[in-house]
């Protein structure tokens, strides 16, 4: 079952524990490049020293502040998890499940001996298919294994009736994720496509297929996925909330999409009868029907075989793991070396038993004082956003009133959940292979959410991130902002740190998530989380005009020679960064009315605010990863989240005396003016 998607600070969630960095009371000049001019390259000025002292290592395609926290925590998690792995905990206890899963993930000798034996039964089933009915059955069965061949199922809040969950049907099946990988003609994208065909051929070769047949199979898979991609929604179209909402009855699904055996899909996946479903991308589902009806059975079997191989490769022997790394991490993202096995083992445990690990994490690493201070900061930021709403001269009193109602209805989650996920029905068995246990875990998660969500009311207390995640999110259907314990640590937050630094880092993060409730997507949802218009016609038009300034500005920012940022794809996140900065700066000014801050380390409070913001986006990134993110990520690259965002903040100009002669200068009438 696919889970809820939310608007988050970063595209990729990373899990972490307490960091070693100490903010102290001011700015660490070693993180800066004081030779840089803040009006020319503020990113380099604020984070140049950090970037120089944290170069890319072979295993990283990007190394950012977020990744540093991951590095620092993995040592802590390794100690905790390996201690459990060394114990002979009773079967069925959470300690046994964590320890056994980690042992299975890191037992290279056993996995190399087994090679691809764990998936041979599945490959044999596909090979035995003789009919289209058999293909349909296998498509449904693979879905129970977490393998999406043509579509994915989920269950999450109904966008227009947010009190209730609604079954969801999504496009799925593209190995490269984004449809543009299949059609763009630039050299870099063509190179990725060739690497993909090499990867597919290698997977078949590793199972004993001769070179000629392996190459032919790769062409078959490439051709079939390209056909599927023709009617896929791209990353920009997927951001169209109304355009991805097509609610219908289950009977209508059977009538409108008769080319897929929905009865078998629902039966095998344990989904009880339900009345309604949302078909997110109907054109892609129609294309799936067409492919299932028209492609030869042999070609469909090749595709299904590849899907099993691709899904399992990273969990099999080293030779399969190397193949999947060479494509997904190296060819697509630029990493030169795979992660050590122990890190991969920790990732697996974190992904599979995340809430169980999270419970131990918060007990050991998250002080209650952090939650108290964070609660105070959130309250201050909410007050500041209320002031910002009132200050918008382009908004009518009617729309302002609705905006205040939504702001006042925000649900706030900090640190960790009050109730924890129950893993008692998950059985991890050392006698089975690593991959077989992963399949058990996937089925457990699917069954868990089927039972929890299908035909049920939305659980508004549910957390969509684990506590150890270094990220934050806004969920429009519950109108909630969430700040896991993982992000409440330096350089983002420190309970006793200088207010200017805290407001410039975690303060902007808080404001960022709040602004998501009022960005181009979140603004379409009311205070109760329903997709419902609450704007006057004139205000909605003015809002669109103002945000279009942001879109066009980022469209003109060059990421690499010949490659610009996608202003439409990144619009929501850019609005959130802009709003986060404005709100947090207002909150800092309010705080300083009662508690004035001195100049520290040669920097005024206002300067420390912006320097702290610039530092949290410090990163080094490979060209391949940058190209991938520009194509798929709704967040702008880290450098542009600094050099693209700050020129639209009037206070930044005043703090650093930025003049018209500065390259980053944007004339006031051309600056974004929203929130």
Q: Could you say what each language-model-derived stretch is?
A:
Residues 1-21:
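Bacterial Sec-dependent N-terminal signal peptides
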Residues 12, 59-81, 212-231, 502-508, ...:
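Short secondary-structure subsegments characteristic of cysteine-rich extracellular domains
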Residues 20-30:
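Short, Gly/Pro- and small/polar-rich lid/capping loops
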Residues 29, 53-57, 153-156, 178-180, ...:
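Short, solvent-exposed loop/turn and secondary-structure capping segments
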Residues 31-52, 182, 186-206, 397, ...:
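Hydrophobic/aromatic-rich, well-ordered segments within soluble, folded domains that form packed cores
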Residues 36-40, 45-109:
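Active-site-surrounding "flap" and adjacent substrate/cofactor-binding loops of secreted or lumenal enzymes
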Residues 84-376, 380:
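Noncatalytic, helix-rich "gating/capping" subdomain that lines the substrate-entry/channel surface
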Residues 221, 256-259, 271, 278-282, ...:
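Intrinsically disordered, low-complexity linker/terminal regions across diverse proteins
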């Amino acid at each position: 079952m696919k889970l809820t998607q939310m608007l988050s600070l970063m595209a990729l969630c990373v899990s972490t524990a307490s960091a070693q960095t100490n903010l102290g009371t001011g700015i660490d000049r070693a993180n800066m490049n004081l030779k840089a001019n803040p009006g020319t390259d503020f990113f380099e000025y604020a984070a140049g020293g950090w970037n120089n002292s944290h170069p890319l290592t072979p295993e990283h395609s990007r190394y950012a502040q977020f990744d540093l926290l991951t590095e620092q925590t993995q040592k802590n998690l390794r100690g905790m998890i390996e201690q459990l792995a060394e114990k002979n905990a009773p079967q069925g206890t959470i300690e046994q499940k964590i320890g056994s899963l980690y042992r299975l993930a890191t037992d290279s000798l056993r996995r190399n001996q087994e090679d691809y034996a764990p998936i041979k039964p599945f490959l044999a089933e596909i090979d035995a298919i003789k009919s289209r009915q058999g293909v349909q059955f296998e498509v449904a069965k693979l879905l129970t294994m977490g393998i999406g061949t043509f579509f994915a199922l989920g269950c999450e809040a109904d966008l227009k009736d947010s009190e209730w969950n609604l079954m969801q049907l999504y496009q799925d099946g593209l190995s490269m994720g984004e449809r543009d990988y299949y059609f763009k003609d630039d050299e870099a994208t063509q190179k990725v496509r060739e690497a993909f065909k090499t990867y597919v051929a290698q997977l078949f070769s590793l199972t004993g297929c001769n070179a000629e047949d392996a190459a032919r199979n790769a062409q078959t898979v490439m051709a079939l996925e390209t056909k599927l991609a023709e009617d896929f929604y791209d990353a920009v179209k997927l951001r169209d909330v109304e355009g991805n909402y097509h609610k219908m009855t289950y009977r209508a699904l059977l009538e409108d999409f008769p080319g897929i055996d929905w009865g078998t899909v629902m039966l095998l996946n344990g989904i009880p009868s339900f009345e309604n479903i949302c078909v997110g991308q109907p054109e892609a589902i129609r294309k799936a029907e067409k492919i299932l009806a028209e492609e030869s059975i042999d070609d469909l079997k090749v595709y299904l075989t590849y899907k099993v191989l691709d899904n399992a490769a990273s969990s099999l022997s080293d030779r399969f793991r190397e193949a999947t790394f060479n494509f997904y991490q190296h060819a697509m993202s630029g990493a030169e070396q795979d992660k050590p096995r122990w890190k991969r083992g920790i990732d697996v445990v974190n992904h599979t038993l995340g809430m169980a690990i999270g419970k131990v994490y918060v007990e050991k690493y998250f002080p209650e004082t952090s939650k108290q201070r964070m609660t105070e900061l959130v309250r201050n930021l909410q007050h500041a956003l209320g002031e910002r709403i009132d200050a918008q001269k382009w908004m009518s009193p009617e729309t302002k009133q609705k905006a205040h109602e939504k702001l006042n209805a925000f649900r706030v989650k900090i640190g960790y959940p009050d109730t924890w996920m129950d893993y008692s029905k998950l059985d991890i068995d050392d006698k089975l292979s690593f991959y077989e246990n992963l399949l058990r875990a996937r089925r457990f998660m699917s069954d868990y959410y089927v039972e929890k969500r299908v035909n049920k009311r939305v659980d508004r207390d549910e957390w969509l991130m684990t506590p150890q995640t270094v990220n934050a999110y806004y969920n429009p259907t519950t109108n909630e902002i969430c700040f896991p314990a993982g992000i409440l640590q330096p350089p983002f937050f420190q309970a006793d740190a200088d207010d200017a630094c805290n407001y410039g880092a975690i303060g902007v993060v808080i404001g960022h998530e709040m602004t998501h409730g009022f960005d181009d997507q979140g603004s379409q949802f009311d205070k109760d989380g329903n997709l419902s218009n609450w704007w006057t016609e004139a205000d909605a038009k003015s809002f669109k005009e103002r945000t279009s300034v942001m879109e066009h500005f980022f469209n003109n920012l060059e990421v690499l020679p010949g490659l610009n940022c996608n202003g439409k794809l990144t619009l929501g996140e850019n609005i959130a960064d802009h709003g986060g900065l404005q709100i947090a700066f207002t909150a800092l000014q309010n705080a300083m009315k009662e508690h004035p801050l001195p100049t520290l380390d040669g920097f005024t409070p206002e300067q420390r605010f912006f320097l702290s913001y610039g530092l949290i986006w410090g990163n080094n990134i490979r060209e391949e990863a940058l190209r991938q993110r520009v194509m798929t990520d709704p967040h702008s690259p880290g450098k542009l989240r600094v050099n693209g965002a700050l020129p639209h903040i009037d206070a930044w100009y005043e703090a650093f005396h930025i003049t018209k002669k500065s390259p980053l200068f944007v004339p006031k009438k051309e600056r974004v003016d929203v929130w």
